[in-house]
C-alpha cells in the first residue's frame, strides 16, 4: 500500500482579477477589469423580482442530509455507545441511519444480541429516542445481512430451483426393467438395470419401472416432483399424472420408447449472507407470497411486544438470491399468465428443439418469473410496510424482474455505485489496483427513471461501495462519484457506510469488509462535515420540483427476454447490465453526449401514460416525445397504446427500424398478424430503411436509422453545455423556472458564454461547495437564446436556478482571470501569475497517532511529513500543521487564490489567525483575498489531514492483530486476502 503524502506540486498564491462582462446588443465580449472595476458593471436592473426566498439557499431538512448504512456487528451494541455513534454522525452532518445487523466480532460473543429479541428491540427504541432528539431518521434492514431469510424459514418457504432428471426409455417387452437416473441436472446420464422376472410374464404384463428418487442427496428431503413429461420417439408428448408414482417408482408399459423428463422443485439451500446472531438460516422464496407472509410475521410479533416504533423505511439490498429459478407455484402461475401448459415444453425450456420455440418459451418463462417477483414480493411487501406506517427502500438490480416495474412499485428506488470511476480529473489520486465502477450512468438511471415516471420523490443510492481499498478513501474521490449519482437522478444518498464501534475499542475499531469507514476512527472524518454540507445543499435543490428530462426511452425488455441466450434464468446484475442490451446502453450514453436526457419506461408504465396539453404525461412527469430504440419484439398491446398516444397528439419515434415480432408462444401467429395490421394502419413502410415520418391522428410517427436526424424531429432542444462544453447536467422543473445541477467530470474547463435550452428572465448561480450565491452574468446570442457566463474547472460543480419572470439585482457571480504578481527576487523584478509560498516553514504533528512531539523546520517549499527523519513519521495518521510568515506584494488584484496543485488529503487554512476555509476536493484551491493583507507580512497555517493508510500499514508490518471479525473478516476489493504492509 502506498504511503499518503502531502502534495506533489508547489503551493502557490495566484492573483485573480474580476472580469467585466460587457454586454452590447446581441453580441458578447470579455475584457479584463481594472483593479477598481467590480462585477457591479454586470448588474441586472431590478424589476419585478422573484420571491426573495427563491433566491436563497433552501432551508436544510433532515432528508437533505446524506444517510449511512449502519452495520451492527453481532448486534453487540449498548445504549451508551449507540448514543456516542449517533452523536458523532449527527455532528458530521449525517441525517439518516439504516440499521443492518451483520456477523459479529471475535471474542465479543457475550455482547451479541439476537435479532428482534426483546433486548434488540430495546436497543432499537433507544436509537429512535436519541435520533428524535438529534432530528435524525432511522431506517432498518428487513433482515440481517442479505437476502431476506433466517431461522423461521423452513424448506417449504425457502428459495427454490429447477431440478430435472431424465430417463431414456428403450422399450422392452422381455422383462420388467428398473430405470434410474444417476444425477439431477438437465444433462443427466442414466443407467438401466433389469430385474429378474419369471418366464411366465406375458408381454402385456411387462413393465418399465422408473426410479424417480432424487439423486442429489442434499435435495432428497426437500425436492417436490412437479411434472412428468413423456416424449415419444416419434416426437409426440404426454404429461403423465403424478398420482401414478408410488414410493418414487413409476411403472410404464414396456413398449414405451422415448424419454421421460421429471421436473422437481428443489431448494437452493442458500443461507443468509453475512447474517447476524438470530438471523441465520435459509433464504426465503421471493417468488412466493405465502413465504413472504410467513417471513414478515416475526416483525409483527417483535413490534407488538415492544415499545419501539415502526421504522421510517424498511430496506432490501440488491437481489442476491442465487439460482432461485423456480417456485412451487410457478407451473400454475405460468398457466394462468401465459395461457398454456409449460410442462409440454420442458425440452424447450431446457434449450432443446426448434430455436424459435425455445426463444418464445424461455421469454414466457422469464416474464412469468419477473411478474411473480413483482406481484408476490415487491408489491405485497410495500403494502405490508404501508399498513404499519413505514416505507420501502429497495435495490432491484440483481433480480430476474423488469427493473423499471420493480423500482416503480416501491417507495424509494435505490441504485448502487460499486467501484471507482475513471474521471481523469487533474490531481485526483486514484489507486492503480482499484475496481472500476460497474454503476455506469446508463445503469444508474433505471432507479431514477422509475422514480420520475411513477412520481416518487426520492431516488436513493448505496454510495461508494468498494470505491477504494480499505483506509484509502479520500473526500476528493467521493465528490465526483456523488456528482455522478446526482447527475443521474439520485437525490437521497446513503454511504456504504458506518460500522458501529464501541468508543473504547482499540483503533481501528470495528470494521465492515466493504465500508469506506464513515465514523470517528477514520482520520478524514473530522472534515466530513464539508462533504456532507455539499451533499445537503445539492439535495436541497434536487428533492424539489419535478424531473425535466423531456424524452421517454422505451426499454425493449422483450428483446432481452426472447433473444438473449445463455441459461433460461436471466438476472440483471449491476456488473453485467451492459451485456444484456449493449445497443440500449450505448444509445443512452450517445444521447447524453449530444445534450439530451431521458427517462426509461416499461411496457407496464407506458400503458399508464396519457397525452394531454401537448405533452406525454406519466404519474410523475411530463415529456415531449417517446423513442423506441432498435426494438425487434413488442406486444401488440404496447404498439396499440403508442398509436393511441400518437392519435391524441404525441410524437412517437422509432430508431433503426420498427418492431415486427411479438414475444412469447401462445397464439404467436395471431398476435403477429395483429402487429402487422397495426403497422398497416399507420401508413409507415416497415421494410424501408431510410427516414420516414407520417401524420397519425393529431400526432406524428417517425422512423429514422440515424439518431441525430431522429432527434431533430423530437421538438427537444439539446443543452449545449453538454454537447459543446462537455458539462454533465440534470435539470428539474420548478413552478417558477428550472434548476440545473452541472458538473465537469472530465479533464477540460469551461470559461465561456453558454446558452441554456430553457428560456429565463433571470438566473441565479449557487455554489454548493462554498455556499456562495449571486445573480448570473447573462446575455443573449443571435438566436435570442439566453446565455450565462460559466467558469468551471475540472471537478467543479454548480447549481443554476432560472426564473420565468422578473429580474434580479445585485452584484453578479464573480468571474476571474489570473493577474500578474510582481515580487522581488535577488534584486530582480519578475512578473508571474503565481507567487510560490516558499520560505522558512515550520511543521508539527497535531491530532493523530502515533504521538510525535516537537516542531520541525522546512526551508523553501513544505515537504511531506513522511520525509521527516523522525520515528513514526511514516506511520502517522491524522493532522499535521504547516506554518509560514510571508510578505504579500501590493499588487492590483480583486482576490487571491491559494492553489495546492495536489493534496493528500484535506487542508484547513488559517490566515492571520482567522479561519479561512477547508480545501478537500479538486481543484485543490481556495479564495483568500478577504483574509490577506497586501503589502504587509501575513501568516498562514495549513492543517493537513491524511488517511489512515500509513498507520494500518505500520500495524501490519508490526503484526498487530486488528482483523478480529467473523465471516469474511477483511478482504480486498477483489474479495481476496490482503495485507497493507507494503
Task: Specify the residue positions occupied by each region the protein language model found.
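Short acidic/polar inter-strand loop motif in beta-rich domains
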Residues: 269, 806-808, 945-954
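Carbohydrate-binding surfaces of carbohydrate-active enzymes
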Residues: 82-83, 96, 113-146, 152-153, ...
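Aromatic-lined ligand-binding clefts that engage carbohydrates, nucleic acids, or primary amines
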Residues: 755, 886-912, 919, 940-944
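Extended acidic/polar, glycine-enriched regions
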Residues: 216-304, 780-833
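Bacterial N-terminal signal peptides
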Residues: 10-22
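Acidic/aromatic-lined carbohydrate-recognition and catalytic surfaces
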Residues: 102-187, 201-242, 252, 260-266, ...
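Short, surface-exposed tryptophan/glycine-enriched loops
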Residues: 926-937, 943-948
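Mature N-terminal segment immediately following signal peptide/propeptide cleavage
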Residues: 49-96
